[in-house]
């Protein structure tokens, strides 16, 4: 009976994907670890120098889909990396290596690297770092781990492509996001707002990939910030998007699909918060519980799509790409909304950027959302001039009504932020994918999609927006939203014409794809700052210590299902083993007189915290190993294990392993 049930579940899992039609694509998916250094590195996202790592909640992964159109031989690689943002340099280096080592047809237009936008991952991988508010350090080792992990995930998928069927499905996701900038949204025309049922985009779109009728994974687009885990957190975490992926992959594994890859990509999350209470708190008892709840809601929605009948994508893979100098891009009167030609502006942060999003915990106390040129303060301008430089009058006028705080695009000899940015449009059958390096608000996304739809018409039935892709460059708001200068407007770097410039360019790219016209010749490229960066070593990677051996605070002898298990052990700094240790924490279960791993530090129900007490020779380094059991945990005998590397006085790094005393998990009431 057990095997009949298992077969029935697997059959239902793959039922929507069964088809007798001949596949028109080759495809495969893959996943690689890209976890950053877990101790002492500032996290990327909240721009708080005091938020540095002290351990791991979940690991970071790069998940890839590679597709080849069998008839045209064209390729498309789509990756979501669980980091806050992807710099263009990563795409540049990955594309170069793909071209030289794998396939020369890879290029900037068909390698799409999306950031999940977790705010709980280490920074240090951006070349524009000298005056960055997200991190002023550049770590070549962690940059290499991110770059190589993305490359290896694409390579693995490319090498195992098989005839595949691609289907698209949709559903509505409830209680997973809320508009955090409602006053800005309400500034949009009432007639436009009435065209939509909600102030956020609750639609989830999923591209499912199946081989021989069995799903091997999917790419899922739904826009919501991974900010359930707030700036109080000190543990690396992929937040709600990563948890959704882990839940989907675990569910597939139950059906015997051990290589299943679930990509929860980032979309139009610009003004969408998962903190449903709009006060930096979510629906759970703490930040980790809230992250799990919002992640699970996305996972459940994705399962609903899997169980429904999807629409099979027909043959046809095309794409186009261009670099745009957003510091001075002309916007024609047809798109400007002012009746005359306009331009975008050199990038600038506004006062309200420094205010942060109030609903996500806010920023500096000197600022508040809604500050415009009318709210400028002479002492703030003086401090900003001392920290960077004063903006020109031309920049203030171009960015109006933004109260310019830092004129990032006017610094010399080079701008302090990238001005030349990558954009693209890809079509996979009837699915159109807009590619942007920005966080795009709900209404901005709708206008961009409508622009593409107005050109492509019946050539596309589904359109998704892939934000935070191939670079990072702040937000895109509508001109009306920009005028309110909430956080998102203050972080719309290139001024009030930014969205209109992109509407214009996506219109042109849509025409190129519709007519089969050649892409616009590339005359500009992003700056190469390779010779200007000053790489640093990963902190604490060379700390000498004796071999850790002791259990400092053992686990209890017994726990009920649902209780939290912990054990404190002596440890070397985890950064000594950075990128070499597959897991610093294992949960092992005794089965048939043999210990077998059942959990690692990649799982959402484990954590480890690094601590250092004392100074100099009397300092004690330790890890707190934590496992949150659940009602689904099977009774039995378990133990927590720590593995790592230590650097001896002889200069050699060696492995060590510490096993905590075993304990029993029992049913409640026993």
Which residues does each predicted region cover?
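N-terminal signal peptide c-region/cleavage motif recognized by signal peptidases
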Residues: 14-16
């Amino acid at each position: 009976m057990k095997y009949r049930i298992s077969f029935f579940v697997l059959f239902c899992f793959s039922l929507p994907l069964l088809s007798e039609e001949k596949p028109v694509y080759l495809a495969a998916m893959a996943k690689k670890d890209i976890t950053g250094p877990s101790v002492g590195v500032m996290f990327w996202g909240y721009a708080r120098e005091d938020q540095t790592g002290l351990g791991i909640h979940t690991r970071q992964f790069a998940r890839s889909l590679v597709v080849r159109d069998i008839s045209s031989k064209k390729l498309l690689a789509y990756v979501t990396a669980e980091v806050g943002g992807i710099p263009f340099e990563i795409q540049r280096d990955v594309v170069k290596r793909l071209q030289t080592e794998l396939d020369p047809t890879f290029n900037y237009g068909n390698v799409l690297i999306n950031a999940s936008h977790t705010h709980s991952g280490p920074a240090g991988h951006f070349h524009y770092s000298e005056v960055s508010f997200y991190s002023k350090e550049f770590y070549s080792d962690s940059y290499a781990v991110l770059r190589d992990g993305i490359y290896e995930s694409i390579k693995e998928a490319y090498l195992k492509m098989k005839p595949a069927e691609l289907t698209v499905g949709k559903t509505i996701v409830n209680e997973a996001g809320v508009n955090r900038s409602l006053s800005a949204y309400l500034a949009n025309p009432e007639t436009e707002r009435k065209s939509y049922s909600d102030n956020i985009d609750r639609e989830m779109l999923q591209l499912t990939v199946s081989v021989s009728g069995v799903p091997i994974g999917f790419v899922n687009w739904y826009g919501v910030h991974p900010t359930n885990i707030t700036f109080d957190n000190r543990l690396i975490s992929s937040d709600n998007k990563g948890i959704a992926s882990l839940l989907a992959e675990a569910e597939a594994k139950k059906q015997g699909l051990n290589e299943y890859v679930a990509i929860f990509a980032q979309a139009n999350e610009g003004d969408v918060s998962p903190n449903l209470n709009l006060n930096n708190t979510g629906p759970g008892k703490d930040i980790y519980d809230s992250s799990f709840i919002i992640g699970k809601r996305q996972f459940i929605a994705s399962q609903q799509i899997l169980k429904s009948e999807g629409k099979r994508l027909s043959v046809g893979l095309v794409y186009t790409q261009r670099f745009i100098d957003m510091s001075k891009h002309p916007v024609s009167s047809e798109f400007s909304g002012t009746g005359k030609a306009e331009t975008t502006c050199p990038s600038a942060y506004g006062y309200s950027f420094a205010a942060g999003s109030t609903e996500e915990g806010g920023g500096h106390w000197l600022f508040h959302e809604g500050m415009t040129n009318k709210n400028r303060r002479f002492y703030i301008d003086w401090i900003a001039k001392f920290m960077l430089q004063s903006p020109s009058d031309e920049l203030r006028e171009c960015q109006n009504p933004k109260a310019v705080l830092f004129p990032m695009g006017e610094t010399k000899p080079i701008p302090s932020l990238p001005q030349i940015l990558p954009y693209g449009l890809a079509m996979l059958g009837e699915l159109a994918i807009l590619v942007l390096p920005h966080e795009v608000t709900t209404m901005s996304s709708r206008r961009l999609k409508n622009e593409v739809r107005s050109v492509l018409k019946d050539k596309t039935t589904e359109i998704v927006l892939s934000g935070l892709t191939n670079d990072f460059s702040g937000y895109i708001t509508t001109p009306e939203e920009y005028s309110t200068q909430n956080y998102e407007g203050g972080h719309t770097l290139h001024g009030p014409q930014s969205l209109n410039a992109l509407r214009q360019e996506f219109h042109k790219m849509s025409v190129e794809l519709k007519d089969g016209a050649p892409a616009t010749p590339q005359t500009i490229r992003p700056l190469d700052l390779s010779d200007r960066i000053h790489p640093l070593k990963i902190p604490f990677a060379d700390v000498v210590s004796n071999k850790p051996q002791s259990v400092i605070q053992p686990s209890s002898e017994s726990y009920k299902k649902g209780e939290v298990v912990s054990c404190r052990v002596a440890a070397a700094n985890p950064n000594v083993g950075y990128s070499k240790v597959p897991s610093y924490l294992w949960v092992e279960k005794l089965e048939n007189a043999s210990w077998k791993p059942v959990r690692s530090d990649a799982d959402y129900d484990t954590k480890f915290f690094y601590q250092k007490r004392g100074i100099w020779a009397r300092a004690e380094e330790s890890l707190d190993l934590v496992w949150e059991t659940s009602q689904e945990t099977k009774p039995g005998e378990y133990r927590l294990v720590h593995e790592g590397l230590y650097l001896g006085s002889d200069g050699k790094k060696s492995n060590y392993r510490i096993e905590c005393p075993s304990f029993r998990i029992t049913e409640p009431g026993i």
